[in-house]
Amino acid sequence: MDPSEYRTIYTVEDRHWWYAGMRRITLALLDETYRGRANLEILDAGSGTGAAMGYLARFGRVTGIDLSPLALGFCRERALTRLGQASVTALPFAAASFDLVTSFDVLYHRAVGDYRDALREFRRVLRPGGRLLLRLPAYDRLRGRHDAVIHTGRRFTTGELESSLRETGYRIERLTYANTLLFPLALAKRLAEPLLPATGSHQSDVAPNPEWLDKVLTAVLGAEARRLRQHDLPFGLTVVALARK
C-alpha cells in the first residue's frame, strides 16, 4: 500500500461510509455467531491503522499484527498496545492460541504471495473449533485506479474462496457477498474510469466525503447488515467468509 494511504485511512476510517458500513456488517455476523460472548482470544491479522481492533474488543481480548511499521504506529496513536510486526504467512504465535482470527482486506495484497499460506497459518493458531472471519474485495473486473494505490494482487469470488478454504482444512459456516446495493454504482464508476482523465498520482477511493453522503451510504450498508444476519447475498463488491477449524 502506498504510505500516504495509511494516513488517509487513519483520518477517515471512523466515519467514512465504507468503513462504517463494513463495521456494521462485521458486527452483525459476529453478534449472530457469539451472542454476547466477551471472553474470546482474538487475532486481527493485518490490523492496518487499528479501527477494527477497537470494535472487536467487545468480544474479548484483541491482538493485532501488521507487516507495516507505519500502520502499527497509527494503531499506537489509538492507544492500542497488543501489537506485533509480522506477516500473515508467518505468525509469531503458538498453535491453538486464538478463538477467532479476523483478516479484513489483507489477503488480496500482492505482498502476501500465496494467500493459502496465510489461511494455513490462521488455522494453525486457531484453537479447536475456532473461527476465521475473512473480508476480501470481489471480482477482478472491478479493478480500478484504487487497486493500484493499495497494491491489489487479486480479487476474489465466493467460489474461489470456498475452494481455498476447503483445501486448507476449514468448514465453511457463512460465505456471501456484501456491499450489494451499491454494486451497480461501483461497476459504472469502474467502467467509466478509463474514459476519465487522471486527477493526480493519488487515485484512491478513500477520501473525506460530505457528512450527509457518509450517513446515507452507511445506512444502506446497515440495511445489508441486518439482512446478512440470516441470509447470504448473491453478488457485491466484497466477499465475506466465516469458517471453522
Can you say where each PLM-predicted feature lies in the sequence?
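A SAM-dependent methyltransferase catalytic signature shared across enzymes that methylate proteins
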Residues: E162-A178
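Short N-terminal helix/helix-N-cap motif within the alpha/beta-hydrolase-1
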Residues: A111-Y115, G144
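A short glycine-rich, Lys/Arg-flanked "PGG" loop and its adjoining helix->strand segment in the class I
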Residues: R116-R131
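Short catalytic micro-motifs in class I SAM-dependent methyltransferases
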Residues: D105-H109
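C-terminal lobe and adjacent flexible extensions of AdoMet/dcAdoMet transferase-like proteins
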Residues: L221-K245
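Short, glycine-/aromatic-enriched active-site segment of Class I SAM-dependent methyltransferases
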Residues: L132-R154, E160-S163
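Conserved catalytic loop of SAM-dependent methyltransferase domains
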Residues: A51, R174-D214, T218, P234-T238
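Conserved N-terminal segment of class I S-adenosyl-L-methionine
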Residues: M1-A94, L100-F104, L119, G236-V239
